[in-house]
Amino acid sequence: MRNPLMQPWLTEKSTGLTEQKGQYVFKVKSAANKTEIKAAVEAKFGVDVASVRTVNCLGKTKRQFTRKGVLAGKKNDWKKAFITLKEGQAIDYYSGSTDQGEEKKSNKG
């Protein structure tokens, strides 16, 4: 798998984990495993990863009531990874995403 990291998961809860325990949360591809996630984080941000925990999140079921009846659907399932770094290290989300954005722009131009 090329790059299992999709985006950082920035919520109040994940920000609290970052400040208190030094854990970072990422939305990752569903097929990614812990070793691939660890290698991707270490390569992209240049940090040492102590541990990786993953959670499979189920997509919500949605219903829409119309004149023709009830239309049922489901959002996609996804995976969330909790990354714990070694003591004294930190990730700057914005520097990592800026580098990737510049690469995308240069490929188009």
UniProtKB/Swiss-Prot annotation:
Similarity annotation: Belongs to the universal ribosomal protein uL23 family.
Self-association state and partner proteins as the record states: Part of the 50S ribosomal subunit. Contacts protein L29, and trigger factor when it is bound to the ribosome.
NCBIfam families per record: PRK05738.1-3, PRK05738.2-4
PANTHER family registered for this protein in UniProt: 60S RIBOSOMAL PROTEIN L23A
The UniProt record lists the keyword Phosphoprotein: no
SUPFAM superfamilies from the UniProt entry: Ribosomal proteins S24e, L23 and L15e
One GO MF term attached to the UniProt entry: rRNA binding
Swiss-Prot/TrEMBL keywords: Ribonucleoprotein, Ribosomal protein, RNA-binding, rRNA-binding
Organism superkingdom: Bacteria
Protein name: Large ribosomal subunit protein uL23
A cellular component annotation (GO) from this entry: ribonucleoprotein complex
Role, per record: One of the early assembly proteins it binds 23S rRNA. One of the proteins that surrounds the polypeptide exit tunnel on the outside of the ribosome. Forms the main docking site for trigger factor binding to the ribosome.
Pfam families: Ribosomal_L23
Gene3D superfamilies to which the protein is assigned, alphabetical: 3.30.70.330
GO biological process: translation
